[in-house]
UniProtKB/Swiss-Prot annotation:
UniProt keyword annotations, A-Z: Cytoplasm, Fatty acid biosynthesis, Fatty acid metabolism, Isomerase, Lipid biosynthesis, Lipid metabolism, Lyase
Listed pathway(s): Lipid metabolism; fatty acid biosynthesis
Catalytic activity: a (3R)-hydroxyacyl-[ACP] = a (2E)-enoyl-[ACP] + H2O; (3R)-hydroxydecanoyl-[ACP] = (2E)-decenoyl-[ACP] + H2O; (2E)-decenoyl-[ACP] = (3Z)-decenoyl-[ACP]
Function according to Swiss-Prot or TrEMBL: Necessary for the introduction of cis unsaturation into fatty acids. Catalyzes the dehydration of (3R)-3-hydroxydecanoyl-ACP to E-(2)-decenoyl-ACP and then its isomerization to Z-(3)-decenoyl-ACP. Can catalyze the dehydratase reaction for beta-hydroxyacyl-ACPs with saturated chain lengths up to 16:0, being most active on intermediate chain length.
Protein name: 3-hydroxydecanoyl-[acyl-carrier-protein] dehydratase
Enzyme nomenclature, EC number: 4.2.1.59, 5.3.3.14
Family: Belongs to the thioester dehydratase family. FabA subfamily.
GO cellular component: cytoplasm
Length: 171
């Protein structure tokens, strides 16, 4: 189900994890705790810094999020890898929004920089994904640059996020 305005609620994102949003052959988001997104604010086919597409999404932060209890005891901080994974999740979600089929897999990232952190007193994480290229055909792949903001302050950047969609994942 492609919303023209590209906005999706938490309920929609959870439906994606069950294969109910983009159909049984479309890419899925992870379920439950590994879903690092509460809502997608907007997606465009021709927006962003490179004019190839843009996604903006958010996660509400509260002190009882699962990772704060274990990373680290007496020094809670969101693992940076979860912010990176959220950006990969959004690249795959965008490929599904464009009506591509296959199982999503992160294929790599060029460079990641961490300049800040998400702490239990943070309120909101914003993810911004600027697409550089979408390849369709035998290979389906999205390549994008991303950034993560905590309460409006940029804390992570990732260049050349790559996600592919595969019909067969038994490789």
């Amino acid at each position: 189900m492609m919303n023209e305005d590209g906005a999706y609620s938490k309920k929609d994102l959870e439906a994606s994890s069950r294969g109910e949003l983009f159909g049984p052959k479309g890419p899925r988001l992870p379920a439950s705790n590994m879903l690092m997104i509460d809502r997608v604010i907007t997606m465009t086919k021709d927006g962003g810094m490179h004019g190839k597409g843009y996604v903006e999404a958010e996660l509400d932060v509260h002190p009882n999020l699962w990772f704060f209890g274990c990373h680290f005891i007496d020094d809670p901080v969101m693992p940076g890898c979860l912010g990176l994974d959220a950006m990969w999740q959004l690249v795959g979600f965008y490929l599904g929004w464009l009506e591509n089929e296959g199982k999503g897999r992160a294929l790599g990232v060029g460079e990641v920089k961490f300049k800040g952190q998400v702490l239990p007193d943070s309120k909101k994480i914003t993810y911004c994904i600027d697409f550089k290229k979408v390849i369709t055909g035998k290979l389906i792949m999205g390549i994008a640059d991303g950034k993560v903001l905590s309460d409006g302050q940029q804390i992570y950047t990732a260049d050349d996020l790559k996600v592919g969609l595969f019909k067969n994942t038994s490789f």
